[in-house]
Regions:
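N-terminal signal-anchor transmembrane helix specifying type II single-pass membrane topology
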Residues: 2-61
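Catalytic core and acceptor-binding pocket of nucleotide-sugar-dependent glycosyltransferases
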Residues: 407, 415, 419-552
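Active-site-proximal specificity loops/subdomain of glycosyltransferases
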Residues: 339-381
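Peripheral, non-catalytic regulatory segments
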Residues: 103-281
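C-terminal catalytic/acceptor-binding lobe
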Residues: 486-677, 916
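Acidic donor-binding segment of Leloir-type glycosyltransferases
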Residues: 313, 317-350
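Contiguous segments within soluble domain cores/interaction surfaces
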Residues: 678-788, 792-920
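GT-A fold catalytic core of metal-dependent nucleotide-sugar glycosyltransferases
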Residues: 234-236, 371-422, 790-793
Length: 920
């Protein structure tokens, strides 16, 4: 019996021993990994210093929710927030170009002699090396190298800055004051956020980190850990004896950093009671005198009429309007000079900067404008900055009353609660430098200690006293000097500079978390990284309001929100008309429905030869000249044929009606006798097989070169393409099942340039397809065919214009107009050509004709261009621009109607853009 028990025991041991051994091995591995995790050193430099952790309630969220931005509330958004790729595997190639092989010296890997200079230091940062290589000018390369050397030497930014906020009172306001040792719990942390786990942990490090992130309490635990928290001080029932918090700090063994589940809590100097003010709203009772406002307009582009309309909505003699026009926009600046000469309180900046998106030049412009206003036009209470895409949501009088009732407050919109997320997405821990029209990323940096960092929207309403503090050199202190140094090399600096200056200065108790704006965020469309051509980062921009967004406008009726953005009449003038009617008509404002407005026209300059920013392309100039000849041939002009090339084009404008592009308005002639003609593009879209259900689903098929992914539209409204253009297809689909269609591009010689399969998902959608063709494209009439299972769904024809020698020179024109020297792409497309029924003989004949056309010059080239233009454009009418001698209007033919009385003319009267008293 005993022997049987021994045998059974041995058998049981043999059977279960492997499981026991595996369990012991797993336990040993877990202990080893835990030891490594708590003892691994952490770098004190760069963006990873305190990029630990989410709050405990965030830990259960999916990674897509914690990293995405689409589900967050509008109040938590910065106005131009970045969508940084946090996964290293998804980082952009531009960030890797400066990398050098392992073990190689990064500076030695650069051939500085080829770059034209030798830097003052050994540059090792890969982002800086990448930027220097990509810069196109020697001056910019030197600037980038000098800034990098200063940053590497620790001479670019101050290590610590003073904070003079006095909003908190008593002992709580003393940074570093000990509250004692407290019992912590893994399941219910005393302080909710683990800010860092680092071997650099210590009292000053943890307190400074929590101060930076906006927490009133900092806690040290287990030597390596730093926690931050908000709300009331820790409860006394969890208080422990001080000897439980005696574990040495890894950075300084003479200082203790808490203990095991024992948290040593300190004050950071921020009040535990929220200090942001509540604004007075609604304004009732006795109202003080209206606030005087300095409206600072930073405008770009060519939407002159929209700027005039904005000024008309806000204009009053008691206010001052300071307008900064981007240095690249000569047309806008010249058009607004008339207002300055007529209205004494409208001032145009003479020191103009090219304020690129995200650039430090924007902050430089804002501070410079503030200084000029304070010195030259000092009689104002508030500064409100606007752009050409802003428009008021309420009458001007209500804004004046609101600011008067809240005199002394500063209105800025903060990013929300998660400062660390904002720091990461805004790239605040990286050095940037602006030169050559681009913001270059130069590498990581250490932010100054001692600051409460804040940021959000760069659209603000600031009191005059605060503007004096930040803008006047004689008012600057150590804090302002350091902040200007820091934000002079920061991406989107205006989104953080004013917020941070307010939070750390004597003005910290004047902050109202409301910038008085409604911003139309649609992040799935607006976060398309469309600014990478001017910045080494990825960001978002708000969308233009359309009639479908009226419910968002209507929801602001009873809120202290006075402006909205963005509005663009080339996208929707109707929205601006509705809004203007809503705020000016009490009956409309009382109604929840959108006001009914009639269709109206909108005009915007496309080209003027006198503009210093004229960037017209060769083929566009060719088109404008040909359009004037087309107008002359269709109108009943009796003058002799104009000289070769046609009359001198004085201007070209875009014309819209009912939010639809109608055509181009081309003017020519002399100041005393000019003519404007209206020409419209023909519609060449055709449906395919009527028996194919997919054909009815294709709603729009257009070809252009300037696609806006944010607005899902083509920005080159005339869709004028040349041999060097990059054509793409905008296609819109109705609801239906997912399918794959084939896009076939055919040139004028019936050569299939490319064939591509494009996926169309279920449901309504707008997509853009851009092929990559070798250049130059063959001039002439192209065809784009869309097939489903090789049955025709739809097609459209589009024009690729040749260029004339006057634009590029005879030799260059012949080379460009001759088409490609080989195939457009490296694929055999003969099967597609056979399917389309294009015989070799037909293609050979068309190719020979195309080669002959490409060699045309002089009048023959003009006739070819004019024939192509006439095939794709139609003449709609002409009018006379009356000059000094009205009799000369008849010199070139029958009497034409006056443009001032012609509905479609850009010279017709428009009351909505008449600013101030009528000129005498």
């Amino acid at each position: 019996m005993a022997a049987s028990r021994v045998v059974n025991r041995n058998r049981w041991c043999r059977r279960h021993f492997p499981f026991f051994a595996v369990g012991v091995a797993i336990l040993v591995v877990q202990v080893f990994l835990g030891y490594c995790f708590y003892t691994v050193p952490s770098s004190d430099d760069g963006a990873d210093e305190y990029a630990v952790a989410r709050t405990r309630h965030e830990a259960g969220k999916s990674s897509s929710e914690s990293q995405g931005s689409h589900g967050r509330q509008q109040s938590a958004q910065s106005d131009d927030e970045y969508d940084e790729e946090e996964n290293p595997a998804r980082q952009r190639p531009v960030a890797r170009r400066g990398a050098t092989p392992a073990g190689a010296n990064a500076s030695e890997a650069v051939d500085w002699s080829q770059l034209g200079f030798e830097p003052a230091c050994e540059i090792t940062e890969k982002d800086a090396l990448s930027a220097i290589r990509r810069a196109t000018s020697l001056h910019c390369r030197r600037e980038l190298a000098n800034v990098t050397c200063l940053a590497q030497a620790g001479m670019l930014y101050p290590a610590r800055l003073p904070r003079s906020c006095e909003s908190a009172s008593g002992r709580e306001a003393v940074p570093g004051r000990s509250l004692g040792c407290y019992q912590d719990d893994r399941q219910q942390r005393l302080l909710e956020r683990l800010a860092s786990r680092s071997r650099s942990n210590g009292l000053s490090h943890c307190v400074g980190l929590c101060l930076r992130l906006g927490y009133p309490w900092a806690g040290l635990e287990y030597g390596l850990e730093c926690f931050c928290g908000k709300g009331a001080p820790p409860p006394q029932e969890r208080r422990l004896p001080d000897d439980r918090c005696t574990m040495a700090c890894p950075s300084n063994a003479t200082v203790s950093c808490g203990g095991y589940l024992a948290l040593h809590v300190f004050a950071t100097g921020i009040s535990s009671v929220p200090t942001k003010k509540e604004s007075v709203w609604p304004v009732v009772g006795a109202v003080p005198p209206p606030a005087r406002i300095a409206f600072l307009l930073s405008v770009n582009g060519r939407a002159v009429r929209q700027v005039q309309r904005l000024l008309k909505a806000l204009y009053h003699e008691r206010h001052v309007f300071y307008i900064h026009v981007d240095a690249r926009q000569g047309h806008m600046h010249r058009a607004l000079l008339e207002l300055e000469s007529r209205l004494g309180n409208v001032v145009l900046a003479r020191e103009r900067l090219a304020t690129i998106w995200g650039g430090s030049s924007l902050l430089e412009m804002l501070l410079g404008a503030m200084e000029r206003l304070l010195r030259d036009h000092p009689h104002w209470d508030y500064l409100v900055n606007l752009s050409e895409t802003d428009f008021p949501l309420k009458p001007r009088e209500r804004l004046e009353e609101f600011l008067a009732a809240n005199m002394g407050s500063n209105f800025v919109k903060s990013h929300g609660q998660d400062t660390q997320r904002f720091i990461s997405k805004q790239a605040l821990e990286r050095t940037f430098h602006e030169c050559g029209g681009r913001m270059w990323r130069l590498g990581p940096r250490q932010l100054p200690w001692g600051l409460r960092l804040d940021g959000g929207s760069d659209w603000v309403a600031l009191h005059r006293d605060f503007c004096s503090y930040v803008a006047l050199p004689e008012r600057q202190d150590a804090l302002l000097t350091g902040l200007r140094s820091l934000f002079g090399h920061t991406l989107l600096p205006a989104e953080s500079f004013f917020h941070t200056a307010l939070q750390n200065s004597a003005f910290c108790s004047s902050v109202v978390d409301n910038n008085l704006r409604l911003v139309n965020w649609k992040r799935r469309q607006g976060c398309q990284c469309q600014h990478r051509h001017v910045v080494d980062w990825c960001g978002c921009s708000p969308n233009v309001f359309r009639p479908d967004d009226w419910h968002r406008i209507r929801a602001t009726r009873d809120r202290p929100v006075f402006f909205a953005r963005k509005f663009e009449p080339v996208v929707s003038r109707r929205m601006v008309d509705q809004l203007e009617r809503w705020i000016s008509d009490p009956a409309s404002e009382a109604s929840m429905a959108a006001p009914v407005v009639a269709d109206a026209g909108y005009w915007q300059s496309q080209y003027e030869p006198l503009d210093d920013d004229a960037t017209v392309e060769d083929h566009q100039l060719t088109a404008y000249q040909s359009l004037t000849r087309l107008a002359l041939s269709r109108a009943e002009f009796t003058c002799s044929r104009p000289p070769e090339g046609g009359p001198h084009v004085r201007g070209v404008s875009l014309y819209f009606y009912g939010d639809q592009f109608q055509g181009l308005l081309v003017s020519w002639g002399s100041p005393s006798a000019s003519t404007e003609a209206f020409l419209s593009p023909r519609n060449h879209q055709r449906n395919g097989d009527a028996d194919l259900p997919v054909s009815a689903r294709l709603r729009l098929l257009q070809v252009g070169s300037q696609y806006d992914p944010k607005e899902q539209m083509l920005r080159d409204f005339p869709r004028l393409l040349g041999p060097r253009s990059e054509p793409g297809a905008l296609h819109s689909w109705g609801a239906g099942r997912a399918l794959a269609v084939t896009f076939v591009w055919v040139d004028p010689a019936k050569v299939v340039a490319g064939s591509y399969e494009v996926r169309v998902e279920s449901g309504p959608q707008t997509l853009f397809h851009r092929p990559d063709f070798r250049k130059p494209l063959r001039p002439g009439a192209w065809t784009l065919l869309v097939f489903y299972e090789w049955r025709l769904v739809g097609q459209t024809r589009f024009l690729v214009l040749p260029v004339v020698p006057a634009a590029v020179g005879a030799e260059a024109a012949a080379e460009v107009n001759g088409g490609p020297r080989g195939p457009y792409i490296d694929h055999d497309l003969s099967r597609v050509e056979e399917h389309l029924g294009y015989s070799r003989e037909t293609r050979a004949a068309l190719k020979a004709q195309a080669d002959t056309d490409g060699r045309r010059t002089g009048r023959e080239l003009e006739r070819w261009v004019d024939a192509l233009i006439a095939e794709f454009w139609t003449f709609r009418g002409a009018c006379s621009i009356r000059g000094g001698d009205a009799a000369e209007d008849d010199r070139c033919g029958a009497r034409l109607p006056a443009c001032e009385k012609t509905e479609w003319s850009s010279f017709s009267y428009e009351a909505t853009v008449q600013v101030g008293p009528a000129p005498t």
